[in-house]
């Protein structure tokens, strides 16, 4: 979270609140601020497979604990969803290339949370950035080293409808 403060400053963001939750359902911040945020970003703990080109040694650790990570991501998303107000958005991001952490996680979230809908990431991208959409068809942002010359990255945008 300390690095986020510097990144916000560089980006000119002044109205962001950085919070590290306890991971418990009875977290006092969750109770106090439920359904109050326009935008919640979940920078999910993940396998980091998208950073293999910069950290190739992590390839040998990729399968260690994947099931645990997927379960943790699911729990973090569910808690974060409680923070988003009606009409607000929840962004789920990983630096993973593994579908279980990305598309499957997004689809499972939508199935479990009918009060949210996917917002096509291309729509969001083109509304705020002057550069062309870097991905193929689909609702999610998925950058890959092979296609984009970047680290692997995934993002899904959800909007609370009720």
Label each residue range with its predicted role.
Residues 1-162:
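S-adenosylmethionine
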């Amino acid at each position: 979270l300390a690095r986020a403060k510097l990144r916000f400053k560089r980006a000119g963001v002044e109205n962001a609140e950085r919070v590290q939750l306890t991971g418990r359902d009875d977290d006092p911040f969750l109770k106090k601020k439920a359904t109050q945020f326009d935008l919640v970003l979940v920078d999910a703990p993940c396998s980091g497979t998208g950073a293999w080109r910069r950290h190739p040694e992590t390839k040998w650790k990729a399968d260690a604990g994947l099931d645990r990570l997927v379960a943790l991501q699911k729990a973090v998303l569910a808690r974060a969803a409680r923070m988003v107000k009606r009409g607000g958005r929840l962004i789920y991001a990983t630096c993973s290339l593994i579908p279980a952490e990305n598309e499957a996680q997004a689809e499972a979230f939508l199935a479990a949370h009918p009060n949210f809908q996917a917002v096509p990431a291309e729509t969001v991208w083109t509304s705020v950035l002057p550069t062309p959409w870097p991905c193929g068809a689909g609702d999610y942002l998925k950058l890959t080293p092979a296609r984009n010359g970047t680290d692997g990255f995934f993002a899904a945008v959800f909007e609370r409808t009720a």
